[in-house]
């Protein structure tokens, strides 16, 4: 009986409406942090440097609709693109659902509270800087799981 279950438990990612798809974003902001790639190993290393369009308090894009105008390299996430990238945070709802895992209790869709991602300490709030203020990314590497 699917009527009692939320959409993310009954639909594949490619079956979701645009509104359902967009609501999966928990607002952690971690996908909007710059990463550096080790030239020798190919390993991605996290920084605490956020895209200039990221509102570091809310974890949301300041101009989501026009973001690619200002940040051409910004990825438009789709079910197909999701499988082609390896840098999404381990807590990302898109990634979790694609891997057959449940959403965590702190996810706003589960908790009903958009602040729950921040209260759980899994967002960028409080430990990031804007790329406009950061300088060299190498000076902003963090030993933190994204």
UniProtKB/Swiss-Prot annotation:
What family does this belong to?
Answer: Belongs to the UPF0260 family.
Q: Cite the HAMAP family for this sequence.
A: UPF0260 (MF_00676)
| Record protein name field | UPF0260 protein Swit_2819
Pfam short name (any one): CxxCxxCC
Q: Which domain of life is it from?
A: Bacteria
């Amino acid at each position: 009986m699917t009527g009692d279950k939320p959409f993310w438990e009954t639909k594949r990612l490619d079956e979701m409406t645009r509104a359902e798809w967009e609501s999966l974003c928990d607002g952690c902001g971690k996908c909007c942090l710059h990463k550096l790639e080790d030239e020798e190993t190919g390993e991605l290393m996290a920084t605490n440097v956020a895209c200039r369009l990221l509102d570091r308090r809310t974890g949301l894009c300041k101009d989501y609709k026009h973001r690619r105008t200002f940040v051409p390299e910004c990825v438009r996430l789709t079910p197909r693109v999701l499988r082609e990238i390896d840098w999404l945070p381990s807590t990302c709802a898109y990634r979790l659902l694609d891997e057959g895992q449940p959403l965590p209790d702190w996810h706003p869709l589960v908790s009903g509270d958009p602040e729950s991602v921040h209260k759980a300490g899994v967002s960028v709030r409080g430990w990031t800087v804007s790329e406009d203020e950061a300088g060299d990314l190498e000076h902003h590497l963090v030993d933190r799981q994204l």
